[in-house]
């Protein structure tokens, strides 16, 4: 058990953050319609691009070549409908990440600009994790995971976000990412995240340590079995 007596300031903040995060993990509101789709396919969804863009593309800089996938993920988060989100595709050495833009941190949550950063170049075995190399449904799932972070940030103050940043430097990160997966399931993207997690494990099935490290390390991301267990316990996925 961790002793508060010997905790560093960063450790204290991380502990407080984890406790707060457990209490504030967000799921789709009861009065909000949640859509669950077992599998999105490009051939079925491409005809809906214009209507999706009109409804969910407002204030969004969509990622080139992944516009449809991003819009499908955004359609599960009505809170983000008018929020400014920039999807950036660049060589950043991590498959995907999400955070508020530093220049907008002092604004109210809904008036901030949020970034979803997608890596464009990975080397060796990690190349399989590039978004372009993943199945369509899995692409929707991992983008949805990053947008689950964005929804969470809508309820975080400047100081809360600073604590979140410190969390990434400690074991608190494990709870942070797992809460993000749980939140995503509540918004109806469980199957998409399941397909993403399954893809990663198929690609690296010969090396379980590689799976852990490539997905963030230390069991930070839920396995397909864990995701399925939560879905099976939810009435949203009863059908």
Label every model-predicted segment:
Residues 135-151:
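Short alpha-helix carrying the canonical HExxH Zn2+-binding catalytic motif
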Residues 12-22:
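Bacterial N-terminal signal peptides
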Residues 190-239:
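Long, well-structured alpha-helical subdomains associated
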Residues 26-107:
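A metal-dependent hydrolase signature that marks the N-terminal structural subdomain at the beginning
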Residues 2-13:
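Bacterial N-terminal signal peptides that target proteins for export
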Residues 146-162, 186-191:
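Catalytic Zn2+-binding segment of zinc metalloproteases
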Residues 97-136, 153:
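Active-site scaffold of zinc-dependent metalloenzymes
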Residues 152-181:
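Post-HEXXH active-site segment of zinc metalloproteases
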């Amino acid at each position: 058990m961790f002793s508060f007596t010997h905790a560093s300031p960063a450790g204290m903040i991380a502990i407080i953050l984890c406790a707060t995060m457990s209490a504030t993990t967000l799921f789709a509101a009861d009065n909000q319609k949640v859509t669950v789709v077992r599998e999105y396919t490009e051939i079925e969804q491409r005809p809906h691009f214009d209507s999706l863009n009109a409804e969910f593309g407002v204030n969004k800089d969509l990622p080139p070549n992944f516009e449809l996938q991003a819009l499908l993920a955004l359609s599960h988060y009505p809170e983000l409908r008018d929020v400014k989100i920039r999807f950036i595709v660049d060589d950043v050495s991590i498959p995907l990440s999400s955070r508020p833009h530093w220049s907008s941190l002092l604004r109210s949550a809904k008036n901030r600009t949020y970034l979803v950063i997608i890596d464009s170049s990975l080397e060796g075995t990690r190349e399989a994790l590039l978004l372009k190399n993943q199945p369509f449904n899995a692409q929707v799932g991992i983008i949805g995971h990053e947008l689950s972070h964005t929804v969470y940030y809508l309820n975080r103050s400047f100081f809360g976000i600073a604590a979140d940043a410190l969390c990434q430097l400690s074991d608190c990160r494990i709870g942070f990412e797992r809460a993000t997966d749980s939140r995503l399931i509540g918004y109806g993207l469980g199957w998409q995240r399941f397909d993403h997690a399954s893809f990663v494990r198929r690609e690296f099935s010969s090396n379980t340590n590689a799976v852990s490290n490539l997905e963030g390390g230390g069991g930070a991301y839920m396995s397909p079995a864990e995701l399925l267990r939560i879905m099976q316990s939810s009435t949203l996925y009863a059908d």
